Every structure is written in structure tokens, then in C-alpha cells.
Amino acid sequence: SGMLSFQFNFRRNDFPKRETSRITPCRLNEVSSLATIAGQAFVYDRFHQDYKLTAKHCDSLHEKWVTNCCVNGLADVVLVSRQDGDPSGFIACRLAGELNKVRFGEIVLVSVASNLHGQGIGGSLIQAALEWFQERTDIVFVRTESTNYSSVKMYLNAGFSLIESSNYFRR
């Protein structure tokens, strides 16, 4: 399997405007709903590709990952999209420091409820994240599995550039 790394450079790119009014920071009472979304949505990730890990264990890792983003400071903000008041997806964003007066950010984790894929929610989450990052960073990074074609397409459509491809191997 492999990973693809993308970057969005605010000094070079404009980003497409989408409707993001239904996307706001995570509320503590939504963490369990986000964990459920994360536990069910990932199938292309490196954990599920590892034959030594059970699907249940992999799902649990994602549930803990988003929980750590929301309550343990792994992310600086977790933005949540909602449909009919209920969480439909999330994006976790982290400020990653500065080097030579260039400020960096990272999209840590993105997930949309599996029954809502293909409705543009992911693209709206990316838009909301870019709006959040715009005043705080110069460059935003994100990584995804090379086999996660819908995410690759989503990042490219949002103006991200592919900057690196890497493979990883397991014994």
C-alpha cells in the first residue's frame, strides 16, 4: 500500500467557495457520535490493510483517534458538519508550527458518515478547514491512502497539490 501527501499553499492558491454554514466546532456532547462515524467510515486506511489487525480493532483505533482529537488536544479544532442537527462528518485540524516564517497546518483526520458519502459533505468540510486555516497558516498538509480515490479527488478538486508518494510494506 502507499500514502499520498498533498499541500495547499495559501500564497499560491485560492480555494473554491462552498456552503459551510452547517459546519461548526465540535461540541463535547457530539464526541461519541463522531467516534461512531470514524469507526464505521474507514476502509481504505493503512490499519485495515494490515492483515494482523482485525477490522474491529482498526475501527476502535479510529474511534480513539477522533476522541483524542476532540478532547485530548491532538487537534486544535474539530469542525463538524450536521444534517438535521446530527453530526454527518468531521475534519480535525492542527497547527503544526513555523519554519522560516512559513506557518504550517495539518488536516489530521477527515470522515463522513458512510451512509452519506457522495453528497459533497467531505468537500464542504475541506472548505471549512481551509477557511479556519487561512488566517493561521501559509501551507496545509494532508495525507491519504493511495487507494482512497474519492479522497484523492476531493483534495485535488479543493486545490491541493500532490507533493509526495510513498509506499510501506509489512511482514
List PLM regions with ranges.
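Conserved beta-hairpin
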Residues: 74-95
